[in-house]
Regions:
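Terminal transmembrane helical anchor/hairpin motif
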Residues: 31-50, 172-226
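Pore- or pathway-lining transmembrane helices of multi-pass membrane proteins that form conduits
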Residues: 20-25, 165-182
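Membrane-helix interface segments
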Residues: 16-18, 92-94, 98, 164-170
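Transmembrane alpha-helical segments in integral membrane proteins
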Residues: 66-78, 83, 154-169, 224-226
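Aromatic- and glycine-rich beta-strand/loop motifs that create alpha-glucan
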Residues: 1-22, 163-166
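Helix-loop-helix units of permease transmembrane domains in multi-pass membrane transporters
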Residues: 73-105
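Secretory targeting signals
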Residues: 28-66, 98-163, 204-211
Length: 226
């Protein structure tokens, strides 16, 4: 398994689609900055900027992003007609798939760190009040952790829709709808704790300072595990 994972990391150098992931992380931050221009009475500071980046990542960007990249990586062996050669090594498709999914999990963390960097750069440019090193570290931890938990939330979709070349695009659409559904689930705390997409927020205590927000870590963990 270690060799499979190492090989998949070597292959990443050939995958230009990874730049699409970087671009989508930038888009998440730019979209957040765009919404900050709306005169809706919200008071923007660095903490609120971070919260909005996390929300946009959850609802519109990351589930679709990681499903696209994971599906592309998994389908390459079929698209390039190399799967039959790999299986003669012999390596089972199950082991190959597991190795690719592990790499995708690492990528979700890397994209979280990239998104965190873009968020801090945006803060430096715009200059919202309340920026502190400790808050920046907390923001990086939360953004990165939420990305990883979102990956776990869409993992079943990726695994089920990547069996055939090209079919992963169906998974991308499903993942987008699945992520967008988090916007509606977030309106009810019971549903938010049960819905895997919003459960990722509960795992990092998103807006836990708000008395109306009551996360149940046990329920959130079970939701993601199932």
């Amino acid at each position: 398994m270690v060799r499979i994972v190492k090989t998949e990391f070597y292959k990443l150098k050939r995958y230009h689609i990874l730049w699409a992931g970087v671009a989508l992380m930038l888009l998440s931050v730019l979209l957040t900055l765009f919404t900050s221009m709306a005169n809706d009475g919200s008071v923007w500071d660095f903490a609120y900027l971070t919260e909005q980046v996390i929300k946009n990542n959850m609802s519109m960007i990351f589930p679709m992003c990681i499903s696209l990249i994971a599906g592309y990586m998994i389908s390459r062996e079929q698209t390039d007609d190399t799967l039959k050669n790999i299986l003669t090594v012999p390596i089972s498709f199950k082991k190959l798939l597991t190795g690719k999914l592990i790499v995708c999990g690492v990528l979700s963390i890397i994209f979280g760190l990239i998104c965190s960097l873009f968020t801090i750069i945006a803060e430096m440019i715009v200059g919202f009040p309340g920026f502190e090193i400790s808050l920046a570290l907390k923001a990086a931890l939360q953004i990165t952790a939420v990305n990883f938990f979102l990956y776990l939330a869409v993992l079943p979709i990726i695994a089920l829709t990547c069996r055939r070349a090209g079919s992963f695009l169906v998974g991308v659409i499903i993942a987008f709808v699945y992520g967008y559904g988090g916007m509606f689930a977030a309106g009810n705390m019971t549903l938010a704790n049960l819905y895997p997409i919003t459960a990722s927020l509960g795992m990092v205590g998103y807006r836990s300072y708000d008395t109306a927000v009551n996360w149940n870590i046990g329920t959130c963990s079970c939701s993601l595990a199932l």
